[in-house]
C-alpha cells in the first residue's frame, strides 16, 4: 500500500514537470520560428 501511495504522489509531479517543460520548449520553438508550417530554409 505504501508503494501505491508513493506512485500516486510521484506520477502527477513527474507528468506536471514533463508537460510543463514540453510546453516551454514548444513556446520557445514558436518564438524562434514563428510560422512552423513553412520553413523557408528547406526550399
UniProtKB/Swiss-Prot annotation:
Under the heading HAMAP family, the entry gives: PSI_PsaJ
Q: How does it sit in the membrane?
A: Single-pass membrane protein
Q: Which UniProt keywords apply?
A: Chloroplast, Membrane, Photosynthesis, Photosystem I, Plastid, Thylakoid, Transmembrane, Transmembrane helix
Q: Which GO terms describe its biological process?
A: photosynthesis
Q: Where are the transmembrane segments?
A: 7-27
Described by its record, this protein's role is as follows: May help in the organization of the PsaE and PsaF subunits.
On whether Calcium is a keyword of this UniProt record, the answer is: no
Do you know which InterPro entries this protein is assigned to?
Answer: PSI_PsaJ, PSI_PsaJ_sf
Protein origin, superkingdom = Eukaryota
Extract the Pfam families matched here: PSI_PsaJ
Q: According to its UniProt record, which protein family does this protein belong to?
A: Belongs to the PsaJ family.
Annotated localization: Plastid, Chloroplast thylakoid membrane
Record's GO cellular component terms? chloroplast thylakoid membrane; photosystem I
> What is the protein named?
Photosystem I reaction center subunit IX
